[in-house]
Structures are given as C-alpha cells and as structure tokens.
Amino acid sequence: MTSLAAPQTGLLRQYLVLTKPRVTQLAVFCAIIGMFLAVPGLPDPGRVVFGTLGIWLLAAAAFAINCLIEQEIDARMLRTARRATARGTISAAQVISLSGLLGGAGMLVLYHLVNPLTMWLTFATFVGYAIIYTVILKPRTPQNIVIGGLSGAMPPALGWAAVADAVPAEAWVLVLIIFIWTPPHFWALALYRNHDYAKAGLPMLPVTHGQRFTRLHILLYSLALVATTTLPYIIRMSGLLYLASALALGGMFVAYAWRLYREYSDALARRLFRFSILYLALLFAALLMDHWAGLLA
C-alpha cells in the first residue's frame, strides 16, 4: 500500500510544481483585492469563493501549458532544469490533460457560478500568457515582458468583474500598476540569471542589450511605478493611508533600483526581485486597508 502511495504522491507533487503555485498565489491575491475593492461593503461570499477558485484553476492551467511549451528551454536552464517537463518524467499528454482539466473546470465554475464576463476575460488572459507571451513574444523580442505583461497584470480586473459584473476605470488603474511593475520585477531576475537565459537562447533584455542598459531601465520603470501608484489617490479611489503606503513602498523600490544601477551585484538584483514581490503584495494590501478605513470613517 505504501509503495503504491509514494509514486502517486510524487506525481501529484510534480503536477503541483507545474502550476507554479507561488506565482499563482500572488496573482490570485491581487484578484481577491480587486473583488473587495469593487463594492462599497463586503462582496457576495459565493462570488468571492467561486471567482477565486475559477481564476486559480485557469491560472494553474496556463502555467502548466507554459512549462510544456518551454520544456526544452527549461532543460537548458539551471533554475528550471528540475521541472518534470524538463526532465521528461511527465509526458506531453499528461500535461495537456492536466491543463485541460484545470482550465475546463475553471471556465465552468466562472461561467455558471460567477458570470460569463469573468470567464471570457480569464480565458483571454490564459491565451495571452500561454500562447501570445510564451510562444510568440518570449523567444522573439527583448520587449517580451513589456508587451506580454498585460496578461499577468489582469488579475485585479478579473476579480473586479467577478463581483461587479463590470470592469470600470478603477480596475484598469490596478491593471496598469501591475503592468508597470512587471518589467523591473522580471528584469531583476533576468540580471542575476543572465547566463541561464543566454544559454537557453532567450532574448531577455540583459542578454540583448547588456547589464547596464537593463539596470537603467529598471530604475526608469521604478520611477514610473511610483508615479503610477499615485493614480488611485488622484482619482479619489483611495485616501491618504494608501498614498502614504504607496510612496513609502515606492521609495524603497527606487532605492533598491538606484543602488542596483550604481553598483551591480547578483545579490542585490536578487534582493530587488524578492522585494518586488513583497512590494506588490503590501501595496495591494494597503489599497484594501484604505478602502475599509474609508468605510469605517
């Protein structure tokens, strides 16, 4: 009995890794924040639960397909060489079945238990990431993460649509914030994984334009990010609590970017990459806290 259970557990763990759970968690978190910001009070619990489930399922399906498409590239990169698809321990048919099951279930949940708008927007995001970004943009242009970043920026709009049956300007402001955040986040990773990307033949910005050019653009995007994060306050979507948080977090982001530009090290690039994840989570948490503070005032 134990000998049979061990391989099954190992296979399930490999499936889970293909869905990139850490990345999925951040995306789903931003979607949930969008849900809570979409209404004056508390959103409908059913919409939150099933919206979260459906968005998570389709995100996981997209990441699994991404791993399948990039299996040969992943095999040449130290960071991704241990993925089951890169090692060939999971077949293409298994990955397609997994992605089809997750994606199909997600679409059914969103269509029948949330609303068709959220289903179609989430499906478009799936196509944008799994096909347009992975197949067309990533292997062809150093602007891959800039253009393709829209699909990764969509979660707040998906969450908003799940609760409000609409995607107003406020939701697109949140999308814009993540869209501007995405390039410096990924370029920091590409800097300290530069040799990996070069070995894999991917035209990431540090590979095609060099380290200093990339560091400059990280700094420029970090400044643009600080400006963009003031928009919720400017359009009266959020108040002073959010603005103070956004400026404090943005100041830390710019400080990291400035240090990286002045004096590069892999360790500092790694710290910026990790901080950028925390930054986005705290920024969206500040949006929610400010929203609730406004309701209680």
Curated annotation (Swiss-Prot):
Its EC number is 2.5.1.141. It is a multi-pass membrane protein. One of its GO terms (molecular function) is protoheme IX farnesyltransferase activity. It is found in: Cell inner membrane. The keyword Transferase applies. Pathway: Porphyrin-containing compound metabolism; heme O biosynthesis; heme O from protoheme: step 1/1. The chain crosses the membrane at residues 23-43, 49-69, 90-110, 117-137, 144-164, 171-191, 215-235, 238-258, 277-297. It holds the Pfam family UbiA. PROSITE patterns: UBIA. One of its GO terms (biological process) is heme O biosynthetic process. The keyword Flavoprotein does not apply. It catalyses: heme b + (2E,6E)-farnesyl diphosphate + H2O = Fe(II)-heme o + diphosphate. GO terms for cellular component: plasma membrane. Keywords: Cell inner membrane, Cell membrane, Heme biosynthesis, Membrane, Transferase, Transmembrane, Transmembrane helix. Belongs to the UbiA prenyltransferase family. Protoheme IX farnesyltransferase subfamily. Converts heme B (protoheme IX) to heme O by substitution of the vinyl group on carbon 2 of heme B porphyrin ring with a hydroxyethyl farnesyl side group. NCBIfam families: cyoE_ctaB, PRK04375.1-2. Carbon 2 of the heme B porphyrin ring is defined according to the Fischer nomenclature. This is Protoheme IX farnesyltransferase.
